[in-house]
Amino acid sequence: NLGLKNCWGFDMEAACAGFLYALEMGTNMICSGRYKRIIIAGGDHMSSMTNYEDRNTCPIFGDGSACVMLEATTEDVGVMDSFNRVDGKGYEFLHMAAGGSAQMPTHETVDQKLHYCYQEGRNVFKHAVTNMSNAVETIAKRNNLTNDNIAWIVPHQANVRIETAVAQRINVPEEKVMVNVDHMANTSTGTLPLCLWEYESRL
């Protein structure tokens, strides 16, 4: 639909962190000087991995996608800094038991419903609030930013309780935190670009 020709692309899979991973990669590709424009599309088909008999997860997830375009510029705008980490210690709190190379799909794994997303909400909540807050504080300290300098916080849309707790922990007014999970659900990789699209007129 965009009429693009002679372009190349690739897929990345990192679940809820996928858009940030792609943003980091796209930013560095542009900074290398070899690329002028990059389109990042974020989205997941969460309904295909949601167990509708599990009331802990089925109301949380939704399908959605959006994209952004990165462009080289000489202006003092754009992605100025980033802070990324990965921690596999909480794997058992949020995972899909089968479907990968460790446990290949079989008739038995499907019958046992091992291809659905499983999570322990309380542990995910604690982990998310702590690490999301630490990430914001790290970036702010590294760039000499105060809460007055921050126009918006754009968090992953896991649930409203997490976003509210993060805002309280870092002492940022809740009205500065973008929220769309209340009507779009958790669309995984799609949450951040969907927030940017929905709040575009207010940026």
What are the functions of these language-model segments?
Residues A14-A17, G42-S47, R85-D87, H183-A185:
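Acidic, glycine-rich active-site loops and adjacent beta-strand->loop/helix elements
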Residues T50-N51, E92-L94, A165-V166:
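Short, well-ordered secondary-structure micro-motifs
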Residues N1, K5-W8, M12-R34, V129, ...:
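Claisen-condensing/thiolase-fold acyl-transfer catalytic domains that form or cleave C-C bonds
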Residues N144-N149:
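Short, surface-exposed connector motifs at secondary-structure boundaries
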Residues W8, K36-I39, A66-V68, V77-G78, ...:
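Structural motif
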Residues M29-S65:
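Flexible, glycine-rich active-site loops centered on histidine and acidic residues
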Residues D44, T74, N159:
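Flexible, active-site-proximal loop/turn residues at the rims of small-molecule/cofactor binding pockets
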Residues D54-K126, T130, N134:
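Condensing-enzyme catalytic core mediating Claisen C-C bond formation in acyl metabolism
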